[in-house]
């Protein structure tokens, strides 16, 4: 039987945006590689040697960000048609973007392996980027075309619904959890829903090494989530990160018509999935308690006891930088028992 979880807002939690830092490249713009002076998009975050790796949905650059200075080093990803690395409606090439939306970094055989996933919302967006050799001046980048993996995920209708749209990934031991947004349309009796599934990490790595021969891992442990509404707009997952025994997630209330087009954003929430499955969230606010209306696309769990996390806001504006936010978490985020008592 398909498992469902229902999330609820939790008044005992708070997520306060303390700092908003626009992201710029150390070296400025580079017309030769079609790179603007700023990190124009932001989809997901992971810690790598040298900083925080940030993937972008509509620009073929990996940005390695120093969170203290908000300056970034650019790592080139393969160019698209015509040698371009920026994609948007203004250029008329939005359909050609890789749409990288989720990423993880892990120690594999003594080195950091970074893996970023296309959303799978169209056939063009069925690629996986693998980056290794971080000790080199230019880490080694491989673009793996992975239609077999995405076809396998789409076959799991409870997970993918009518329109697969991967938005987050989280690694725990040998299982990779994938998060889908849930903003597509109905597929028969299957309504769109935010959902998760797991795949075997080692099987995935074997597939990425030889996708023409090795079968993709099968999705398992599908969970569908009803995250609720924010200002009347349905919430959908945008990213997730492990923090001790719990899962932190971000979700946005975006009135998009489908898994491809953008829509008006009503705001974002930070949520938690406890070890017992209890799922709750709180809207993001600024230090004055006012609603924070940015579209949070990526999250990185706190690295110490300070309880501050990083999140990236994508402005969906080709002429503006994405923004790295520092967020303070207040309340019983890691204590489900006290949280339930407070509710």
PLM feature segments, named:
Residues 1-343:
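Sequence/structural signature of beta-propeller domains
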